[in-house]
Amino acid sequence: MNHEPKKECFKTSVGGQALMEGIMMRGPEHICCAVRKPDGTIETKIEDTPKHGIWAKIPLVRGAISMIESLITGYRYMMYSAQVSMGDEYDAEEEESAFEKWVGDHLGKKAEDIMLAAAAVIGGLFAILLFTVLPTVLVGGLNHLVPLNRWAKVVLEAVLKVAIFLTYMAAISRMKEIHRVFEYHGAEHKTIACYEAGDPLTVENVRKYTRFHPRCGTSFLILVVIVSVFLYSVLPWSSTSLRVVFKLLLLPLVMGISYELLKWCGRSDNIATRIIRQPGLWVQRLTVFEPDDSMIEVAIAAVTPVLPEDPEDGKW
């Protein structure tokens, strides 16, 4: 009986982000944002991919840089997609706050960069407060009521962190607008999987692939949660406020380790990497849903312009 050798699936660095009625895809040289307009047509916007020089090549350091850059870029394209998808209903002057108008009047072209950076900082601070500070404060408060030993506090803090993260993801996925974004998330994953398998990018081909992908932002976030649990377990509990300070100082290292694990799991397929990436695949059931064909069309429109002529140039 003949057995054909199993074809190794190509792993690409091309990836993206789901938006409001659209998708942003990022390749080695270009970024393309494709958004479904109210009239049913697809609008695309293509820009050069930002370069970060040597810093983007240093292990552990590149993880924090990638996270910050993704927050800023992602927010910018999310705002753009909201504007395009709303069409004539979007009123830039109405949406602009007094503060934004003041910044625009006084800083001109720098205003957008400042507002995007500020939005990214606010979003980052919210995530830090919710997933890093809150569990520690809750355990510290409980410890004043019911004295706990060190490992009881470590375990309880870990359980609270995971519970808060999963509850937050489950809650926002029930919002109608966010649920559609998560459906576009599925279209993004399916399209990348189709490309990596070497199939032509058609709706029929893309539709048959899984919506789950190991190299996903959700997988990175769950890795951050898991790595932080282990790394923070060695920190002292003598003072709740001091523990919070130590956790904040170690956060760039947590992101760096998580990013390197994601890179490793993306390149290798063995028992260890399958175990490490499995929690991320489980959590994707909360953040990635099956798309319809119109969403797949948008994903194809977004990824096609950013694919390198030589696939090796975009190898993971």
Annotated model-derived regions:
Residues N2-V14, A18, E100-V137, G141-L145:
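Cytosolic-side membrane-entry/anchor segment at the start of a transmembrane helix
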Residues G74, S81, F131, P135, ...:
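Alpha-helical transmembrane segments of polytopic integral membrane proteins
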